[in-house]
Amino acid sequence: MAAAPQAPGRGSLRKTRPLVVKTSLNNPYIIRWSALESEDMHFILQTLEDRLKAIGLQKIEDKKKKNKTPFLKKESREKCSIAVDISENLKEKKTDAKQQVSGWTPAHVRKQLAIGVNEVTRALERRELLLVLVCKSVKPAMITSHLIQLSLSRSVPACQVPRLSERIAPVIGLKCVLALAFKKNTTDFVDEVRAIIPRVPSLSVPWLQDRIEDSGENLETEPLESQDRELLDTSFEDLSKPKRKLADGRQASVTLQPLKIKKLIPNPNKIRKPPKSKKATPK
């Protein structure tokens, strides 16, 4: 018996995955943090560590919330004896009396600082900061790379400090400190800010030239205790103002490099209509 003829092979019903096309532009500029000298790094870390220990700034977490036991069933709770419950209640009262209130202590010192990348970013946008310090151990580096342009546009000294999180986080009771900044209303870190700013290297962004200079050259040497609060605020405002080297009437000559297109890929999902042919008109 002859074999039945087979149907011609058909194409697969499974559709091919469309090619994802993304347009990207190459940035001709390389923006990076300026290198900090080893001597300045040790000075900044030691100064901050000593001051934070002297003030006693620390975050205290509630151990009850951290070591909270799961909800017990009714049967297991009924088996517990009354004597054990009474002894546990007495122990809890004693420990509660010894434990401190959870949160930052002292609270007024915490309000003078911005801790964390998000908090530092928001404070920079509101122009509330005097000095920004970023840890070098951040991975990936783009987590803090936006602070370079933002700090320079706000005329705030900023630098990347190696081992910042390793040295400062245990002192204030945190696991890590990726960014630390000092606000303009600070009163407990005035001397430290004045001592650190001259050691901060200047940032370089091609389209933000001459935005900030060495802020430590023109600092007043008078003791801050003899100055009023108004003079302190004005001195910090003058410290944060940009100082331009350009003379009157001259403008900064910034040469912008052209953007280079990496690759042009036609969109395969685009439906291309065939050109309409002109119909012959009857004579």
Curated annotation (Swiss-Prot):
Places the protein is found: Nucleus, Nucleolus
Parts of the chain that traverse the membrane: none
Record carries keyword Cell cycle: no
InterPro entries: Ribosomal_eL30-like_sf, Ribosomal_eL8/eL30/eS12/Gad45, Rpp38
GO biological process terms on file: rRNA processing; tRNA 5'-leader removal
GO CC term (a single one): multimeric ribonuclease P complex
GO molecular function: ribonuclease P activity; ribonuclease P RNA binding
Residues annotated with Phosphoserine modification: 12, 226, 235
Keywords: Acetylation, Nucleus, Phosphoprotein, RNA-binding, rRNA processing, tRNA processing
Pfam families from the UniProt entry: Ribosomal_L7Ae
Modification sites for N-acetylalanine: 2
Main location: nucleus
Function: Component of ribonuclease P, a ribonucleoprotein complex that generates mature tRNA molecules by cleaving their 5'-ends. Also a component of the MRP ribonuclease complex, which cleaves pre-rRNA sequences.
Note: Autoantibodies against RPP38 are found in sera from scleroderma patients.
Protein name: Ribonuclease P protein subunit p38
Organism: Homo sapiens (Human)
Lineage, broadest ranks: Eukaryota, Metazoa, Chordata, Craniata, Vertebrata
